[in-house]
């Protein structure tokens, strides 16, 4: 789920408690949105004037605004941390290359070394920006959302509790498949980088012996192999997202069906049914956000 070596980077361990607190505040905003909106709709359904629902509508928008502020503040903090770590990693990597000398570059491949320093560090920066908050949100927010759902309607809580592990299992299985394809794709990318840079270095020699056109076909074949590996990894990633969306949509549909039938039979009031139904998609949102 998360690379444990990430915790060895400076500042990451200090960021985790902050992100955890922000996740709790985000849950409070989510729960407030659901309760305020359900209350306003219930009052309108009961025939009350819209002016009587204004405090609840304002409460809903206040929670919505709080949620956006939390997301903005978290993004800014993670952007700053990721930039600092990426800058440090790039400097450390360049220092290590200079210390080890040309032998290390030759073993790794000059093209691979160049792409690692340039694009590889950028990918690490994006990884830090995304993974820390997504992992904590997935671990904290769904579990907290279950608390009000069980208070509102325990049957909906059971449905959500039972479907969550199945989505996790499918994510793990498809994740392992995507990991294998991604590793093969990265190896092909390394080979392509080294192959292309070696070609640039020896282009004059290739022209001298009249082999430049033949060598261009070799580069094309390598790039096609890289394209196929990339598309294969993307197909598995898309399948993972589709499977997760299917489980999430199916779970919310089951909750909505049960709530609708019980509303018709008079076994549940409108307010708890609406609040539970609004919270159901929010329960799966951190998981879907992590999978994307």
Residue positions per predicted region:
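Membrane-integrated ABC transporters
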Residues: 1-30, 50-55, 74, 78, ...
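An intracellular "coupling" helix at the cytosolic face of ABC transporter transmembrane type-1 domains
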Residues: 8-14, 102-106, 119-128, 132, ...
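Transmembrane helix-loop-helix hairpins at lipid-water interfaces of multipass membrane proteins
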Residues: 13-70, 150-155, 267-270
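Transmembrane helices of ABC transporter permease
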Residues: 19-25, 133-184, 257-275, 285
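Hydrophobic alpha-helical transmembrane bundles that constitute the permease/transmembrane domains
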Residues: 24-32, 65-72, 124-127, 131-143, ...
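Hydrophobic/aromatic residues in alpha-helical transmembrane segments
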Residues: 33-37, 58, 74, 78, ...
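Helix-loop-helix
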Residues: 43-56, 148-162, 239, 243-292
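Cytoplasmic coupling helices
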Residues: 76-95, 136, 160-204, 211, ...
